[in-house]
Amino acid sequence: GIIVDSRLSAFLERADAVLARLEPLLPAPRQTIDWNQCLAARWQREGRSGFLLPLDVSLEMRLSDLIGVDKQRETLARNTQQFIDGLPANHALLWGSRGTGKSSMVRALLAQHAKAGLRLIEIERDHLADLPRVVEQLVKLPQRFILFCDDLSFEAGEGDYRVLKSVLDGSLEQAPENVLLYATSNRRHLVPEN
């Protein structure tokens, strides 16, 4: 009995010391987002993983505030309405010069449809490889999520565009019906032509 007890005691002391050294390296536990209250979040990379960070967003922007983009506004508004209604909808790339209202249009759509369950997830271009992890967290939720990548472009030889293409093509797996990707770019070609 005494030898087993002293070995067990030594083991527990050592395990305690190891845990004390490891715990500061572990990510802090994250609270689950209440999507009934939270309208937007940003994918935040942390080490080899990441988490959704809730954002406070303004719902002041209206689609009618955007001038000179009537056709684009109507097309994107119709696509978004179809998405909310559970009808087929397309991923969208908004292309144009800086300051032409591309990002504002997406935010105005959130303002218009938040009460109908539309939510916005911002994801940086450099984090596109994490798209499957982000989608995995959203797939079983009742809300409709637009994954929003602002200022999308790639350099020649970068592999990230292949990840994006496979997600858009649905070749990783069937894209969930409650997730759509909207991106903006001020480049005419997302990947430079050779």
List where the protein language model places each region:
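Walker A/P-loop nucleotide-binding motif
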Residues: 86-108
